Amino acid sequence: MGMVSEFKQFAMRGNVIDLAVGVVIGAAFGKIVTALVEKIIMPPIGWAIGNVDFSRLAWVLKPAGVDATGKEIPAVVIGYGDFINTVVQFVIIAFAIFLMVKLINRLSQRKPDAPKGPSEEVLLLREIRDSLKNDTLKNPTVP
């Protein structure tokens, strides 16, 4: 079997396709959560604690300046506000995944429905057994 046909067989397996769909949906979900955190959740929280824009929160370790030659030196900044936004995004995504896994586990633990009656094979075996009993009763000399 050639390399291309083996790869095609591998790529068309259900697990690989499911994984690809999951990655695409996950990327889209990440963008939705980012917008939710940055545009809907954090602004009211920032407003409630004094009109704080979390994305601009930072510690300035060294302010921007100009050296002796007139060259601009950028500031050294730790942007912890973006980190806070990212942590909130992570918590939301982790909670959503937790809920999905919990739902999947609950669905997979459901007990299968009890069979509604004997299977076709069991019915056939019973018929054969009964027929053999009748034959034995009618003709007891047959071993």
Swiss-Prot record:
NCBIfam families: mscL, PRK00567.1-4. The keyword Endoplasmic reticulum does not apply. The chain crosses the membrane at residues 16-36, 84-104. Belongs to the MscL family. Its main location: membrane. It is a multi-pass membrane protein. It comes from the Bacteria. GO terms for molecular function: mechanosensitive monoatomic ion channel activity. Channel that opens in response to stretch forces in the membrane lipid bilayer. May participate in the regulation of osmotic pressure changes within the cell. InterPro entries: Mechanosensitive_channel_CS (IPR019823), MS_channel (IPR001185), MSC/AndL (IPR037673), MscL_channel (IPR036019). It is found in: Cell inner membrane. GO terms for cellular component: plasma membrane. Keywords: Cell inner membrane, Cell membrane, Ion channel, Ion transport, Membrane, Transmembrane, Transmembrane helix, Transport. This is Large-conductance mechanosensitive channel. Homopentamer. The keyword Cell membrane applies.
